[in-house]
Structure formats: C-alpha cells, structure tokens
Swiss-Prot record:
This is Chaperone protein HtpG. The gene is htpG. Belongs to the heat shock protein 90 family. PROSITE patterns: HSP90. Disulfide bonds: none annotated. It comes from Geobacter metallireducens (strain ATCC 53774 / DSM 7210 / GS-15). PANTHER family: HEAT SHOCK PROTEIN 90 FAMILY MEMBER. The lineage of its organism: Bacteria, Pseudomonadati, Thermodesulfobacteriota, Desulfuromonadia, Geobacterales.
Length: 650
C-alpha cells in the first residue's frame, strides 16, 4: 500500500483545534496521556495472552520507553502493548466512533473549555494532546501476533489531514514520535521528564524507562575507582516510576495528589474527584478497592452504549477495564480499581457473570459506596448536594431496581418542595420531621419543572392547609414512586391522582356534606358536561382540592397522569388509551354562570363551548397540549367580545 493522504472527520478536527488552541494551560499532561495509553495497551496484550500465548512474541514483560532526542528535537514514547491494525488506526485516530459527538461538541462550544477540561477528558482523546507540544506527530504500530510487515505508519501535522501507509515493524506495540515545537524543547530535558513521570505516572504498573548518560570514574575489578584514569560516559536504562499499585498501599502512605493523579489515569477526567474511597475487604471475599466519585457527570452518562464498570485485577494482573458485574447500573458513574485475591487469572466474561465471588464483591462495594454517600449526606452536606445535582437522577434508578438497598437509598434522595426555595432540597426524613399534627401521608407532584408545578391547581388545598408537597421533576421520578410507596410508615401520595384530600375525619365529613349540597345544585350540569366530553373524560365531579381555579384533570389512583404520558411519548412508547377525571370547583363563579345558563336554555350552544374551554383550560394548566388550538383561541376571542359588549352596555 502506498502512502495515502486522508482528511480527519469534521468532529476530530474540531476536537483537535480545541486541544491545540484552548484546552490546557498545563502542557505536561501530554506525556501522562501517552503513558496512560501505553499502559492500557500493555494491559490488553497481557490479557489476550491468557487465551493466545502467541501474541507475547517472546516478550512477556510490559515496558514503556521514553526516548528524547535533542539533536532531532523529538521525544518518542514506545510500548510493547497490543498495537493496532490499519483498520484500528483509522478507527481510533482518524475518526470518532462515539455517538453523541455533535452534542458533545456543542456542549464544548457553549462553555469556557479551559475552565472545564473534564469535558474533553471524558471523551478519551488523550492522544490528541500530543499536538499541544508538537507540530508533527508520527505513529508506527503493529498488532501483536501479526506479521512484521503488517505494521502501520501514521503521520499528521494537525492541519486537518494525515497520511497512512504500511510499514515494517520488528516488535509488537506502538511507537509515537513527537516533533516538538521550538518553544517546547524543554520536554527533552531529562529532569523535566523525570519530574513529569514521578508526578503523573509513578503508579503505572509497568516500568517507564529512559536511557540516561552519566559521567563516572572507571572502576577496577575490585570495584574501586582507578586513580588518574579520568572519566568516561556511561549510558544505562533507568526506570523512572515506582510501579507500586496505589490501591495496594496503606491509605496513610498515599498522598492526596497521588490519589488525584491515579483518578485521572483511570477515568480520563482532568478534574479532581469529588470523593475517594480506598479500602480492603477481608474474610469470605478478599479484595482491595480504590473507587472515586467524579465531580461532574460525563456527557454520555445516559447513553446505552457507554462503557461502564470499574477496572478488575486479579492479584495485580489486569483482567478488564470495564467490569460491569462489579458495579450496578445505577452506580455507573463510579470509577476505580478492584483487585481480587480469590478469582482465577483466566476468568472469562461468562465466569464474571456467574461467579459467586464477583457477587460478593459487588455486594460489598455497593454497601461501601452507599455508606460513603450517607456519611457525606450527614457530615459534608455541600459536597453531597454537589454530587446529587450531578448524579441524583442515576442514583434514583437504584430505588426502583435494587430492592435489597432500597431503604438505604431512600434516605439519599433529595427533592425540592413547596417549603424550600428554588435550588434548595429536602430529604424524606426532613419532610416527615416537619409534618404537622394530623398529616398522615407524604404528598408529591411530578412534572417537568418546579416553575410549572408551582402553578398547578392541584396544590391549592395543600397550600391552604399548609401541607408540604414534594416537587418531583426528573423523568425517573415516575418510576421512583412506584418503588417507594411509603417512608417511615407514611404512604406517598400523588396530589394529582385519585381522591387525595388532606383532611381529618371530621373535615372529611364536612366536605362530603358540602359536596352533597353542591351536587343538588350542579348535578344535572355535571351530567351535561360529562355527556359533552364523554370521548375525552372518564368522569366529571365536584372538587374538594380546588380553592381558586375553575377546574383540573385528575388521574385514577393507579392511572397515567399527564407527566407520565409526556415521558412515554418522549420515549416513543405507546401511550395506553386512558381518560382522566375532570374536577370542577363548585365555589368558582363560572359554575354559577354555567348553572344559570343551563337552567334557562339547555340547548344553548354556548354551553358546549364552555365545556370545551373548561377541558382545554385544564389541559393547559397541567402543561398538556390541546387538540384544537385554533378553535380554542376563536372561542376565547368570542367570549372576550361578548364580555366587552356587555361591559360597554351594548
């Protein structure tokens, strides 16, 4: 194959421009990223060797070599990892396979990227950081186990194009050569390189080596220096990192900076973690874990194809970088490493799914994460609130799916309410502690936003009674309340479902008597409205929950409310055909107007118009679309004209 020139995908070029021009004030991280990529590549080839020893090619020890060349102005990062085929080079460097790329780039453009480097770190494009310090990058690679002539040479100046061609490569792995910009030649200095490796990559479990030249006095056979022999230069290969697994060290031996740098290594995030969880488990299942709670959610948190799980090692031997079986889906934001002493080294994906030890480890990890979050909730309220704003939606999934930990997870939930200011939250426990005497249930309402819910007519009687109502505004909340039906012996009740009226037994008797009296006055009118709206409503009844509004729509106790219907439609799901209940306020002046008109002339077409307007008004107040906006606006205009004429005495 001859050398071919190709263009980067548009998205790749946009990312490249961001990296080069606006992303990092700290250029040192280019070396961290390349070393991290090399470490990942060695992990993969050693794991493949469990099933296919041929990929080792007689070189069983992983190694990363740094080669600074002051004369050429280059620094090379060479590894004996898994390497890449031509197809993999094109896929991993020339294009971006992630879905959601455009949305991600739009997010980058909207923000000051230099203040939010985690955005690009989440995207896993650390290789492009090379162009911060280099005006030309050359990559030579060969997939482990393939013929020496199956190598690939890739090169680019970051100008929107790259060249790719076949190449001969004697050894497996990848070699990246950075042709440094003139002002970046400091990265050829031995001590600069040492300091970067020590700071960012000391924990990498494979040796990061570099040839160094030292001047020394020759020594005799007895090891003593030879007097008068002058000096000689000697080049030796030195290991720059300690290679001690950070998770295997005692917590007292690990600095905060080391924890942070390891987090950046495993997560490809460029910000500090919000919380570090480092612990050892002993007994039935022995393992060490170093887990992190990120400070920000990744852009692809809700994408089904997103890589999930933590890294799994068995006795410090890498197994997989995304063991989904260790962490349940509702904790998929957790990053880190688990190192087990009990699993076999040749563990397969099938074994991971069925292994009893894996299940025990997962149970322990989940318990530790939940207890850490509970402790944050109690002792570090600001940090927990920051966490919850980022990951609360995901955590709520656990209430629905993790029955064993449901009660513990309930105490981690936070909601806005009619008692909290916008942006402030309350827990279920705090809600119960504030309940006035006589209140026996926990009330909530679901919807798209606090602003919309605050206008809901369903809240009117609760405001009058000074009963607090929780605002549930995340789509997942509809499933949460299916799992959390009660808390501390108090049932959770939706204020827009069923006949939920906050009242004592005595008050309920009074309300029933009042409703019976009103029914004598409006019973025939209610039947008329039901007949007119029969295709759209299940029932028309007098309301005990309305104090100011004329009407509202209510779902059956277990029926679909407006918010659930909206969510199902947004998910392109079939919405079961259902009718809701139209409640009318017997104390509203409109009811008397309609009753008088009905008594005078039951055939008056204006009565039918009023019925349609009432139903549409109820839809609009809950944020639902109306079926015929044109007719609605025409009827409103006609009523305004009639009212205006009456006011003018015409």
């Amino acid at each position: 194959m001859t050398k071919t020139t190709k263009k980067f995908e548009t998205e790749v070029q946009q990312l490249l421009d961001l990296v080069i021009h606006s992303l990092y004030s700290n250029k040192d991280i280019f070396l961290r990223e390349l070393i991290s990529n090399s470490s990942d590549a060695i992990d993969k080839v050693l794991f493949e060797a469990h099933q296919n020893a041929a990929v080792i090619e007689g070189e069983p020890e992983g190694k990363i070599k740094l080669i600074p060349d002051k004369e050429a102005g280059t620094i090379t990062i060479r590894d004996n990892g898994v390497g890449m085929t031509m197809e993999e080079v094109e896929k991993n460097i020339g294009t971006i396979a992630h879905s959601g790329t455009k949305a991600f780039l739009a997010n980058l453009k909207e923000q000051n990227v230099s203040e939010h480097p985690e955005l690009i770190g989440q995207f896993g494009v650390g290789f492009y950081a090379s162009f911060m310090v280099a005006d030309r990058v050359t990559l030579v690679t060969r997939r482990a186990g393939q013929d020496k002539a199956a190598g690939v040479r890739w090169e680019s100046t970051g100008d929107g194009t790259y060249t790719v061609e076949e190449a001969v490569k004697e050894t497996r792995g990848t070699e990246i050569t950075l042709h440094l910009k003139e002002e970046m030649k400091e990265y050829l200095d031995e001590w600069k390189i040492r300091s970067i490796v020590r700071k960012y990559s000391d924990y990498v479990q494979y040796p990061v080596v570099m040839d160094v030249t030292r001047t020394e006095v020759p020594k005799g056979v007895n090891g003593e220096e030879i007097e008068g022999a002058g000096t000689i230069e000697k080049t030796v290969e030195e290991t720059l990192n300690s290679m001690k697994a950070i998770w295997a060290r005692a917590k007292s031996e690990v600095t905060e900076e080391e924890y942070e740098e390891f987090y950046k290594h495993v997560s490809h995030d460029f910000e500090k973690p919000l919380k570090t969880i480092h612990y050892s488990a002993e007994g039935v299942s022995e393992f060490k874990a170093l887990l992190y709670l990120p400070a920000h959610k990744p852009f692809d948190l809700f994408m089904p194809e997103r890589k999930k799980g933590v890294q799994l090692y068995v006795r410090r031997v890498f197994i997989t970088d995304s063991c989904e079986q260790l962490i349940p889906d509702y904790l998929r934001f957790v990053k880190g490493v688990v190192d087990s002493s009990d699993l076999p080294l040749n563990v397969s994906r099938e074994i991971l799914q069925e292994d009893v030890q894996i299940k025990r480890i997962q149970k322990s990890l989940v318990s530790k994460i939940i207890s850490t979050l509970s402790e944050m909730r109690e002792k570090e309220a600001d940090d927990y609130l920051a966490f919850y704003k980022e990951f609360g939606q995901v955590l709520k999934e656990g209430v629905h799916f993790d029955y064993a930990n449901r009660e513990k997870l309930q105490d981690l939930l936070l909601f806005e309410s009619t008692r909290t200011e916008a942006g402030k939250f309350t827990s279920l426990k705090e809600y119960v502690e504030r309940m006035p005497a006589g209140q026996e249930e926990i009330y909530f309402i679901t919807g798209t936003s606090r602003t919309a819910l605050e206008q809901s007519p369903h809240l009117e009687i609760f405001r009058k009674k000074e009963y607090e109502v929780l605002f549930l505004t995340d789509p997942v909340d509809e499933w949460v309340v299916q799992g959390v039906t009660e808390y501390d012996g108090k049932k959770l009740k939706a204020v827009d479902r069923g006949d939920v009226i906050p009242a004592t037994e005595e008050e309920k008797k009074e309300q029933e008597a009042k409703r019976e009296e009103a029914f004598k006055q409006y019973g025939d009118l209610l039947s008329f409205v039901k007949e007119k709206l029969d295709a759209r409503v299940k029932e028309v009844r007098l309301s005990s929950r309305l104090t100011d509004s004329a009407c509202c729509l209510v779902a059956d106790e277990h029926g679909l409310n407006a918010n659930m219907e909206r969510i199902l439609r947004a998910m392109n799901q079939d919405v079961p055909e259902s009718k809701r209940i139209l409640e009318l306020n017997p104390d509203h002046p409109l009811m008397q107007v309609m009753a008088n008109l009905f008594a005078r002339d039951k055939a008056n077409p204006r009565l039918g118009d009023y019925c349609d307007l009432l139903y549409d008004q109820a839809l609009l107040t809950e944020g639902s679309p109306i079926s015929d906006p044109l007719r609605f606006t025409r009827l409103v205009a006609e009523l305004m004209v009639a009212d205006g004429k009456a006011a003018a005495g015409e």
